[in-house]
UniProtKB/Swiss-Prot annotation:
Originating organism: Homo sapiens (Human)
Recorded superkingdom: Eukaryota
Pfam family name, one: Pkinase
Record gene name: STK35
Domain Protein kinase: 202-530
Organism ancestry: Eukaryota, Metazoa, Chordata, Craniata, Vertebrata
UniProt keyword annotations, A-Z: ATP-binding, Cytoplasm, Kinase, Nucleotide-binding, Nucleus, Phosphoprotein, Serine/threonine-protein kinase, Transferase
Additional remarks: Association with PDLIM1 is controversial.
Enzyme Commission designation: 2.7.11.1
UniProt cross-references to SUPFAM superfamilies, sorted A to Z: Protein kinase-like (PK-like)
Protein name in UniProt: Serine/threonine-protein kinase 35
Location(s), subcellular: Nucleus; Nucleus, Nucleolus; Cytoplasm
Residues that coordinate or bind ATP: I208, G209, R210, G211, S212, Y213, G214, V215, V216, K231
Length: 534
């Protein structure tokens, strides 16, 4: 029997033991469940079963009924047959130990992205939620960055990519950046005539990305002059802190580097003009402990809204954009496709070997660098990732280096990810690391055949496969959940050249039953074989 995404031992809130045990990656929902009934704590398997398919089906159907669906654009050719029509059984989501919601939850970073599927959070005590925040469903519905009515996407002609904005314009358009008291020391260019002032640690050059919870800049390190990417996150809401800490914990848990995983340099916590370098598990830092407590309790701990607090993540800079931009701006190249397939499978095998489940694999989160002369992929954005720690003997704490942990038997229950890349079992809320294999299959299939759709909110063209059901387009995982016996037509386009080995491997990666999918290590071996034979 595999591990469960289970709560850890109880400890007094606010104490060192509380933070030491709960900073392993548990969300606030999981902490609440750990203080629920003793029966649920004694039997993690029964608790997971209680959140199984029978109790979850109402919610997804209700969510689908509220969505506005769009028709494919003129001339769109998608031969993939959909599942038979008809009304679907209602699915109701239930969360143990649900917290009463007192206000709307803050928005998430990107459209289409779903995060921890827990009960609704209590509103921050000292900071009212922003007025534009999305309301959490009364039944403890999934939180996400979209409106409750998730818009469908339609395959339409490509849209031009957005150009980068200069740093000065970015700061002028970003009120959050303008009001940061310590930013001049941390990340702004040295002012003219300031010969006696301290050299800034990083100088911002241009804004290269923006989301609901942060801004990403291209920057230059003050001492070395190296180009880096700096992600600035305002910690005024527990939702932002939870995402930031999840990414921080995942990247700092890696003991070795991998060329296909984005390199994390450092994290700086800034408050009231002071900057402090953060390290994972630093119990001597009161700011760090309060940050963890903010995430776990779901309420602001760091102070009043007038005292802005920021996290700055410094990572390697990838000048080639993301996988969407790179692939869709170039002519199809089988050699590049093979190289990318090998790099992606190598990266996922490395993460799973280090007990990290990404849970949000998609082309947006795969970056490109060409500094070596050839394109190198970098898996990035670990905000929804999960570090699967082992269950240690009684009286000892879990050890994230436990080599006995098998991520393919570590059961997760938080439905999160981006809908067009989510595996069927993720929609159900009971899955393992095999969900990453499914998402990778969607990405590789779409990359080979250039299958795209347009995000109805951002109007951005995205690589991704889908199923046509009449005039609607449906995520492959959702369609397989409704009809597990549905046959996927790979390749979809008759003109696509694809070897039999790659066809079969993609079908195995996209199997409705996760037990029929290869794990990351088998996938890496098979990918080497089929790409050499192709």
């Amino acid at each position: 029997m595999g591990h469960q995404e289970s709560p850890l031992a109880r400890a007094p809130a606010g104490g060192a033991a509380y933070v030491k045990r709960l900073c392993k990656g548990l969300s606030w929902r999981e902490h609440v469940e750990s203080h629920g009934s003793l029966g649920a704590q004694a039997s993690p398997a029964s608790a997971a079963a209680a959140e199984g398919s029978a109790t979850r089906r109402a919610r997804a159907a209700t969510s689908r009924a509220a969505r506005s669906r769009r028709q494919p654009g003129p001339g769109a050719d998608h031969p993939q047959a959909g599942a038979p029509g008809g009304k679907r059984a209602a699915r109701k989501w239930r969360c143990a130990g649900q917290v009463t919601i007192q206000g709307p939850a803050p928005p998430r970073p990107r459209a289409g992205r779903r995060d921890e599927a827990g009960g609704a959070r209590a509103a921050p005590l000292l900071l009212p939620p922003p007025p534009a925040a999305m309301e959490t469903g009364k039944d403890g519905a999934r939180r996400g960055t979209q409106s409750p009515e998730r818009k469908r996407r339609s395959p339409v002609p490509r849209a031009p990519s957005t150009k980068l904005r200069p740093a000065a314009a970015a700061r002028a358009m970003d009120p959050v950046a303008a009001e940061a008291p310590g930013e001049a020391f941390l990340a702004r260019r040295r002012p003219e005539g300031g010969g006696g002032s301290a050299r800034p640690r990083y100088s911002l050059l241009a804004e290269i990305g923006r989301g609901s919870y942060g801004v990403v800049y291209e920057a230059v390190a003050g001492r070395s002059g190296a180009r880096v990417a700096v992600k600035k996150i305002r910690c005024d809401a527990p939702e932002n802190v939870e995402l930031a800490l999840a990414e921080f914990w995942a990247l700092t848990s890696l003991k070795r580097r991998h060329q296909n995983v984005v390199q994390f340099e450092e994290c700086v916590l800034q408050r009231n003009g002071l900057a402090q370098r953060m390290s994972h598990g630093n119990k001597s830092s009161q700011l760090y402990l309060r940050l963890v407590e903010t995430s776990l309790k779901g309420e602001r701990i760091l102070g009043y809204a007038e005292e802005p607090c920021y996290l700055w993540f410094v990572m390697e800079f990838c000048e080639g954009g993301d996988l969407n931009q790179y692939v869709l701006s170039r002519r199809p190249d089988p050699a590049t496709n093979k190289s990318f397939m090998l790099q992606l499978t190598s990266a996922i095998a490395f993460l799973h070997k280090n007990h990290i489940v990404h849970r949000d694999l998609k082309p947006d989160n795969i970056l490109i660098t060409e500094r070596s002369g050839t394109p190198i992929l970098k898996v990035a954005d670990f905000g929804l990732s999960k570090v699967c720690a082992g269950l240690a003997p009684r009286g000892k704490e879990g050890n994230q280096d436990n080599k006995n942990v098998n991520v393919n038997k570590y059961w997760l229950s938080s439905a999160c990810g981006s809908d067009f890349y989510m595996a069927p079992e993720v929609w159900e809320g009971h899955y393992t690391a095999k969900a990453d294999i499914f998402a990778l299959g969607i990405i590789i299939w779409a990359m080979i055949e250039r299958i795209t759709f347009i995000d109805s909110e951002t109007k951005k063209e995205l690589l991704g496969t889908y199923i046509k059901q009449g005039t609607e387009i449906v995520p492959v995982g959702e369609a397989l959940l409704e009809n597990p016996k549905m046959e996927l037509h790979i390749p979809q386009k008759r003109r696509t050249s694809m070897s039999e080995g790659i066809k079969q491997l993609l079908k195995d990666m996209l199997a409705a039953n996760p037990q029929d999918r290869p794990d990351a290590f088998e996938l890496e071996t098979r990918m080497d074989q089929v790409t050499c034979a192709a």
